[in-house]
Amino acid sequence: RLLYNYDAVRMDETDTVILAEGIFDVIALTRRLELYDNSHVAAVATFGKKISDVQIYKLQSKGVRTVVIGYDGDAVESVKRTAERLKPYFEVFIADIADAAKDWDELTEAEIYGIFACRLLSVLEYKLKKVQER
C-alpha cells in the first residue's frame, strides 16, 4: 500500500514520522508545523485508519525510529490497534487531539503546537486515558 508524502521521508535522515489518515491532514500538518525543509520530521498518510505490513516496512527501510500516530480524535480503537502493530519496530507516541470532532486541518497552528508540545502520549498513557474517559 501507498503512503502519501512518503517522498518526504529521507533515508537515514528522517527519524520521526507523523502518521495521519488522509492527504488533507498531511497538508495541514506540513504547513502548520513548517515541515517542508525539515529533514528530521515528516508527515505521511496511510489513506485510512489502518497501517499495512508494507507501509510499516517502508518506514523501517528509511531508518525511521519514532512514529507519532496522528489519526483523528474519533479513531480510538484504530489508534490502539495501529500502536500495537508499530510498537515492535518503532518508538510510538499518540498525538491526542482533545476534540474528537476536529481534524488537523480544522485546528489552529497554536492548537497543533500545543498537542505536540504537551499532549504526546505513550501507548500506555493513551490507553489509560481512554479507559478513564469512559
What is each stretch, according to the model?
Residues T14-D15, V26-R134:
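TOPRIM fold recognition
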